[in-house]
Amino acid sequence: RIFVATFSSNTSRLQQIFTAAERHGRKVALVGRSMLNVFNAANNLGYIQKKPDTLIEISQVDNYPPEQVVIISTGSQGEPMSALTRIAFSNHREIEIQPGDTVIISATPIPGNEKPIYKVINELYRRGAKVYYSALADVHVSGHASQEEIKLVHALVRPKFFIPAHGETRMLYQHA
């Protein structure tokens, strides 16, 4: 089985995972309340393109051979109540890590989250999973626009006013 932990709000990453899973004949299950909520909204609005039989319930995972399953999970930052953390520590009521599972954490730790995510990664290793994360593999692409992408948006939208509102002081100055 392949687990992919990502931000639930990253719908383009969800689409990438569905596309890759279908290309390789795998079913996809979702785990984590926010993952289910965001997926349902994106799917209902037509932002997720998938075959009708690709998505399965997490309770159906054991009905398929491990090489036919991808599980998309919340918890890429090691949040204590996230699905991946609960799965890693055998506190999830529907699924647990099995030796040989592959876990991809597709986000770089946000500064300050290193300790909790490495605690989860250590536990995944203890349970026999193969773990891929930003320090070992090229599995993270920023969800933030690059400087050139921001310039393009400004050129397209041509706002009358613009106020940078997110980031550290140095970032706000650079953005302005």
What would you call each of these model-derived segments?
Residues R1-A176:
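Acidic/His-rich, metal-assisted hydrolase cores and their charged scaffolds
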